[in-house]
Structures are given as C-alpha cells and as structure tokens.
UniProtKB/Swiss-Prot annotation:
One of its GO terms (biological process) is chromatin organization. Pfam families: BCNT. Component of the SWR1 complex which mediates the ATP-dependent exchange of histone H2A for the H2A variant HZT1 leading to transcriptional regulation of selected genes by chromatin remodeling. Involved in chromosome stability. It comes from Debaryomyces hansenii (strain ATCC 36239 / CBS 767 / BCRC 21394 / JCM 1990 / NBRC 0083 / IGC 2968). The keyword Iron does not apply. Keywords: Activator, Chromatin regulator, Nucleus, Transcription, Transcription regulation. Component of the SWR1 chromatin remodeling complex. Its main location: nucleus. Residues 1-104, 125-180, 316-341 are annotated as: Disordered. Residues 252-331 form the BCNT-C domain. This is SWR1-complex protein 5. It is found in: Nucleus.
Length: 341
C-alpha cells in the first residue's frame, strides 16, 4: 500500500511538472507570436471597435471631471455683462473724485511746476516775438524782390539788343549760301536701309519746320548732355525780416546710370518712324507744288486749328489762375499780420 501511494504521488508530481513546462512553453510562444503579429494582415482585426473603446474610456473620464457653473453668468444683469474700462475700474476702487495720477504718479510733481514756471512771462515773451516781424518789413522785402527782378529783365533785354546789332554788323562767314536757305542733313534708317539726305530748303518752308520739330527732342538731349554737371546751385534770396541777402546752396541730384546711358544713346544715328517719314515727304510735296498758302487759307476753320486755339486759351486761363492765387495768398498773409497787431 505504501508503495502504491508513493508511485501515485510521484505520478502526480510528474504531471504537475509537465503542466508547468507546457505553460512556460505556451507563454514563450505567445510572446513570439505577439512580436510577429501585424494588425493589418489580420482579417479579424477591426480598428473601429478599438476607436469606440477609446471613446467610451474618454467619455467615462469626462464624466468624472467637474462641470463649470454658469449660473452666475445667466443670472447676471446687462450692466454686469459689460466690459469695464480702466477708468471705470479705477473709480470703483478709489472713488469717483480720484484721478489716474493716484495709480501712476509722474516723475515731476504739480506743485513744483506751478512754483518754478511763470506762465505770464512766457506768454508775454511769445507775444513780443510775434510782433517783431511787422507787415511793413514784409512789404519792403517784396518790393525789393520785385525791383531786382525788373532790373534783371531790363539788363537781359539790353544784352539781347546789343548782340543782335553786333551780329548784323559782322559779315557772314559763308557767302555761298542764301541767308533764307537752310541746309538739312539727315541720316536715318527706313525699311531696314540707311538713307542719307542733304538738301537746301527755305527757312520758312513746311519741310524745314517739320524737320526741326522732328529733331527737337534729339537736339535738346544733346545740349543737356554737353552742359557741365555741378554738385550744387547757388541762389541768393532775402529772408523776410532781414535786409541782407543770403546765399543758399541747393544740392543737385547725382545723375544715375540710366541718365548716363540715355545721354550716350542720343549720339547714335537718328531713326525716323513711318509717321515722321511720311510727314517729311508730305512737307516736301507741299513745297514743290506751292500749296502752302492754299492749305493755310482752307485749314483756318479745321479741327487742328480749333484745337490749337483752345490750347492757347487754356494756357492763358492757367496763367490768370496762378496770378490770382498768388495775390490771394499775399492778401491773407497781410491780413494775418494786421490781426496779430
């Protein structure tokens, strides 16, 4: 009997050891399978079920969170809901008679300012300085400027007359040319070819006028390029309130690279457009057929003549407007000076 019990106990112990070994092997296999497991390859895997479980867990956590109490906001009146400004909060805290300086005192006290500064003396000083520039001095300065401009105009007119007399007395260097003839030399590209022309035409002919009008911009650019460049321009002016003229040096603008390029570009050969070439051809045809007088008589009531007349009229209106504006400005200045007295 004792042997049978011993064998039974040994058999039970062996079975328990085998079950323990089997459990350990199963756990190791499960760990290996978990490492090699891919959720995407599993046909029974449902991602939506996992998301629903996470939502349920978050809902359970949110149920345990404390809810805010909005009863005070719902029961508040309209005035309590309004946002109060800084001054209103300050009045509630310190009273209606308290100022902002109670919170933010300045670096300088008001008592020291009232003791050290004499407001009456400053006012009298400013009033005395404003009365120093009288309208009589202003009128005198304006009259001096007008006298200077008139004297400059008179000297320029005399110099022009003397130059005209001297040019009339001197003999002409080139006697071969008629004084009423003008030599036109033009070199231009037309239709892909370089064409050079030189002819003698009357100074008052339509072709000469058309040529001078077409080359006006080119000659003006050449003259500007040939002029000497200066860094400043001296201007002498009299300041109101003082009799001595003062020299003002106005600084000129430095020429840019584009201006230099344009000045060199003007030295190239003249290029006429189709419109300018047709204008020159028409002017030469008018001179050959002697149609200038007939065209001038028939075009008096034409569209171009009317446009020129309206343009001259508008220029005169602009001049009168500028003069009236300057006179009104002077009158207002004089009235302000008289009122200050």
């Amino acid at each position: 009997m004792g042997k049978q019990k011993a064998t039974r106990v040994n058999g039970i112990l062996k079975k328990e050891e085998q079950t323990i070994d089997d459990d350990s092997l199963k756990k190791e296999k499960q760990a290996i399978d978990d490492e090699d497991y891919d959720e995407d390859e599993d046909e029974d895997y449902d991602p939506e079920a996992k998301v629903e479980e996470e939502k349920e867990a978050s809902d359970e956590e949110s149920d345990h969170e404390p809810q805010p109490d909005y009863s005070s906001i719902e029961n508040a009146t309209f005035q309590d809901r309004l946002v109060k400004t800084r001054s209103q909060r300050h009045q509630e805290k310190y009273g209606s008679n308290a100022g902002i300086n109670h919170i933010r005192p300045g670096l300088i006290k008001s008592d020291d300012i009232s003791k050290n500064i004499d407001v009456d003396a400053i006012f009298n000083d400013l009033q005395r300085k404003s009365k120093s520039g009288t309208p009589d001095d202003w009128k005198a300065s304006i009259e001096e400027e007008q006298a200077k401009t008139e004297s400059i105009k008179y000297n320029n007119a005399n110099s022009k007359q003397t130059t005209n007399i001297s040019s009339a007395d001197t003999p002409q260097e080139d006697n071969s040319l008629d004084p009423q003839k003008v030599k036109i030399e033009s070199s231009y590209t037309f239709a892909g070819k370089v064409i050079t022309e030189s002819k003698l035409v009357d100074a008052g002919s339509a072709e000469a006028k058309a040529y001078f009008n077409s080359t006006k911009g080119i000659t003006a650019s050449n003259l500007k390029a040939s002029a000497a460049t200066r860094s400043f321009v001296p201007i002498i002016r009299t300041i109101p309130g003082s009799t001595e003229p003062t020299e003002l040096r106005i600084k000129l603008k430095r020429p840019s690279l584009i201006d230099k390029f344009l000045s060199t570009y003007g030295d190239k050969k003249q290029k006429l457009s189709t419109l300018e070439k047709s204008r020159l051809d028409w002017a030469s045809f008018v001179d050959q057929k002697k149609l200038k007088d007939d065209l001038s008589t028939h075009n008096k009531g034409g569209y171009l003549d009317k446009q020129e007349f309206l343009g001259r009229l508008q220029d005169k209106r602009d001049e009168h407007y500028q003069k009236a504006k300057e006179e009104e400005r002077k009158r207002q200045w004089q009235s302000q000076q008289q009122q200050s007295l």
